[in-house]
């Protein structure tokens, strides 16, 4: 932030070009705190560990790629290439360690405070042919022994030649199969492309039709397509079956009770006045029965709208509160 203001935007009123750059005027380095030891030839940089190492102070493992704030300094030269020293501190302890680059071997040297982690590799675990596997003997250091190793390697190649041939045959069959698959795929590439594009067009039309159908029903979210399992599951669902069955049973029970309470002997008067009186009495009795049943029974009241008016009957006695228990 300070560098941006000093170089691009802000110039103090007492500054003029005769006093040099703004950094010279303020007595600052353009790298700010990173150059606090620039008088000693040291620059603070961000150093990334090139390989896995062990810290000799706390025996902590430091993986490849871990970054440190390091002091970079030129200590020597290899021809025209500079040899830099990188000094840094361990994250887990106060141990200081130093690393130098090695231009001659294009590698890094551990000077102090670190030990390189040795990663063992077993070539037999890999799928390389045995002719590519080279075995080294650390105890033989003279030229004669090196020549013997070359001879042994040659004999080893001859011994494992048969295994290499068999493995090559297996790999060649796999390669031939892959080549055949690719050939079959590309032999009619235009026709296959036409079929694929046609299927895409048909699928797009089907999706558009389905989207319009859902919009017509007010469905504004995408739904999955129906399948037979969904249809079978929907058929097995029975909505309010218990309620409908209960209403039917209550209706039948009401009919039976009305029949039981009808008078056995019906009126045989021939006089119209007597008939009118009897009809009025029957209507009054039916209304009383309906009121009593509505009040004291457990039958659904909606059943009276259809059943009681159609099946008029004469009832000589009322129901008790525990009629249908």
From Swiss-Prot:
<feature type="coiled-coil region">
    <location>
        <begin position="156"/>
        <end position="262"/>
    </location>
</feature>
<dbReference type="GO" id="GO:0008380">
    <property type="term" value="P:RNA splicing"/>
</dbReference>
<dbReference type="GO" id="GO:0000398">
    <property type="term" value="P:mRNA splicing, via spliceosome"/>
</dbReference>
<dbReference type="InterPro" id="IPR007590">
    <property type="entry name" value="Saf4/Yju2"/>
</dbReference>
<dbReference type="GO" id="GO:0071014">
    <property type="term" value="C:post-mRNA release spliceosomal complex"/>
</dbReference>
<protein>
    <recommendedName>
        <fullName>Coiled-coil domain-containing protein 130 homolog</fullName>
    </recommendedName>
</protein>
<comment type="similarity">
    <text>Belongs to the CWC16 family.</text>
</comment>
<dbReference type="Pfam" id="PF04502">
    <property type="entry name" value="Saf4_Yju2"/>
</dbReference>
<dbReference type="GO" id="GO:0005684">
    <property type="term" value="C:U2-type spliceosomal complex"/>
</dbReference>
<keyword id="KW-0175">Coiled coil</keyword>
